[in-house]
């Protein structure tokens, strides 16, 4: 009720500036400790698809296409494909973590409820989830960059410049995915995100 002394319009409105603190860091560490037990299977799963793209399309179709000309410079098709695979993997990894994994922690496992029994606010949890998803994306693309170096697809020092750019991609897509997460009633809702937004973004 507006006349009630406990009524606070600022708390009732969802449109407010986030109240952030350093308490997001223990939440981030918690996700890291849990994930560390599954790091190897997670890594293999994240790099399997782009690796198949590189082998099937890069070497297979690359033998037919040969080289592309970009800004007057010849570029091997596999290098062209690998660059897109890196961006696609960053988008996928950040989105998947901020959708399915974060939704499970929020609704299924009730992890967020347990964390909020400590002096940690919801804004700190959301920030930790966003940064964690971005970290997962950065970890994934680092592995793919390692594959590119191992297969001698590229040795350009510009690969180092890709890290901050891909971190920005991870933060951007994890933020958008968390918005969908907040609106979702179940896992099926995420199909709209992948079908109508993420997949067209790859092209």
Predicted regions and their residues:
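Hydrophobic transmembrane alpha-helices and immediately adjacent juxtamembrane helices
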Residues: 1-203
């Amino acid at each position: 009720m507006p006349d009630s002394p406990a009524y606070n319009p600022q708390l009732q409105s969802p449109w407010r500036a986030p109240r952030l603190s350093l308490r997001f860091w223990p939440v981030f560490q918690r996700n890291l400790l849990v994930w560390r037990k599954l790091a190897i299977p997670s890594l293999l799963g994240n790099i399997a698809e782009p690796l198949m793209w590189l082998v099937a399309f890069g070497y297979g179709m690359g033998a037919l296409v040969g080289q592309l000309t970009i800004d007057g410079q010849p570029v091997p098709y596999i290098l062209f494909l690998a660059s897109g695979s890196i961006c696609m993997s960053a988008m996928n990894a950040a989105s998947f973590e901020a959708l399915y994994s974060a939704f499970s922690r929020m609704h299924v496992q009730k992890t967020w409820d347990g964390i909020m029994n400590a002096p940690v606010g919801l804004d700190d949890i959301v920030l930790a989830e966003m940064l964690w998803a971005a970290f997962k994306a950065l970890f994934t693309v680092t592995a793919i960059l390692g594959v590119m170096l191992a297969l001698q697809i590229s040795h350009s020092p510009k690969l180092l410049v890709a890290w901050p750019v891909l971190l920005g991609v991870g933060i951007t897509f994890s933020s958008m995915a968390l918005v969908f997460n907040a609106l979702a009633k179940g896992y099926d809702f995420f199909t709209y995100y992948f079908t109508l937004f993420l997949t067209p973004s790859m092209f």
